Amino acid sequence: MADTTKVDVLVVGSGPAGSTAAMYAAKGGASVMMLERRSEVGTPVRCGEYMPSNGEIVKMFPNLTDEGSLFDIPSKLVCRETLGIKLVDPKEKITLLDMPGYTIDRDLFDQYLAKCAVEEGADLVTRCAFDSIDGGVAKTTEGDIEYKVIIGADGPGSRVAQSLGLNRNRNPYPAVSAQVKGDFEPYLYMFFGDIAPGAYSWIIPKDGRANVGVGCSPRFSEGKVTDYFDKFAEKRGFSEHTRVGGKYVPSEGPVSKTVSGNGMLIGDSAGQVISVNGGGIPLAMIAGRIGGTVAAANIKSSSPLEDYEVQWRRIMEKPLKTAAFNKKLADMFAFRSEWSTRFCMNVLGKRRLNKLIRCQSLFP
């Protein structure tokens, strides 16, 4: 890369949010550069690798339109279709929720989205870390990049957010995962209790293997999240697994503002994550499509970047704020002990647990 590169839209981060934004910005006619600080897109894998079906996504976000084109991924990227979710309380009582979905290999999925962005005309630069902004110029480890619009898709600790003067996520919680071999039912398992204080541990089935992991709230946990993972793996008989990878997950809903000047935040950097379960891939892609489209329109016709704020909030704000409120209720009442977790799950019952997982108000 030259000492100073000029580009219409600079996207920082090549996850689902960044790649989708880069794809739609390029599709809209803008010159686009996408930065990835690692040597390869999608690695290491640090998430649960689960996607709800298109129908379930629309149930959660009823204002979403044209979801088919956004989530139309090749069948070869689908590891396994799942039939539902089994919620397991501290005494192993199971509540089955009918919620179809599918699992993916996150590295291959991310690489596919990045390839789509490149095919639309975006430039992908790996081994390039964003540092700061100086008057419309991004300072990176590979030189300066002059841009017209910058999109921060660089996760909960977003440097882009900091550089734009926007709030970053408060109190994200750690989560770790690994892969294990075996034959598993076509259901996602979520385990609650002391095995994962303030959050849950999971088994997500794939093809002859599973993604297993643990998330913990620092407010309730008394040790490292990796220690809880080891206990969970031992309890479930996972004596052999791949290397454990981790990340931080936003847990308090979207940040108050996602546009500032000629910059915007999308995905985890904007807190666009479902607080009650940590899910974020579909939301990242929804926000990425909006952000990339709005950025291209800004370049082409000077339409305001604030259109992004308006559009994503119309689709996602209410469900995300409802999920964040439900998470606060869980922190206040359910996660105080294993007894309170069991009690609250029994009181809520299957109907309200269905609402909880789908970002809906629990009452009435």
Residue ranges and their predicted role:
Residues Y24, G42-I85:
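N-terminal FAD cofactor-binding segment of flavoenzymes
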Residues T95-C116, S217-K224:
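Short beta-strand to alpha-helix junction loop
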Residues D3-A17:
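Beta1/beta-strand and adjacent pyrophosphate-binding region of the FAD-binding site
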Residues S14, A26-R46:
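Glycine-rich FAD pyrophosphate-binding loop
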Residues F220-V294, I299-K300:
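FAD/FMN-dependent oxidoreductases across multiple families
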Residues R46-E49, T103, Y200, A270-P282:
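Glycine-rich phosphate/pyrophosphate-binding beta-alpha loops
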Residues G28, E40, C116-S239, V255, ...:
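Predominantly flavin-linked oxidoreductase catalytic cores and closely associated redox partners
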Residues T293-P364:
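C-terminal helical "tail/cap" subdomain of flavin- and related membrane-associated enzymes
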